[in-house]
Amino acid sequence: MTAVQRSVGRSVGAVITGMVAGVALTLVTDVVLHKAGLFPPWGQPVSDGPLALATAYRAAFEVVGSYVAARLAPDRPMWHAMVAGFVGFVVSIAGAVATWNRGPEFGPHWYPVALIVIALPCAWVGGRFREMQLRG
């Protein structure tokens, strides 16, 4: 295996690991909040308050996931953070398209739009944290 192949492999691994970290944190938090009764049972409509909370922790976890991608990157940490963010952006668009007007159990339209809007700024913040860490 050449040095370039190793670098590409590490880059792909960094982005995937960062994304998995963000998704895992989100899913665990979702389950905990459902079990605690702060969110309604699965498949039931969710009001604005819990969705605002979900938006806030998803934003925080997107920053964490992007930071992980940047931290594990072999070089260009911001680029890796933004790639992870772009994938999140695309997945958020796909989720919005798939659930738009599908019923109240998917929440109001502002929620998927918010997830789309925050994806890239959160990725930038995660990458920026890593850049600041590298500068000392």
Task: State where each predicted segment sits.
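Juxtamembrane/disordered regions of integral membrane proteins
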Residues: M1-G136
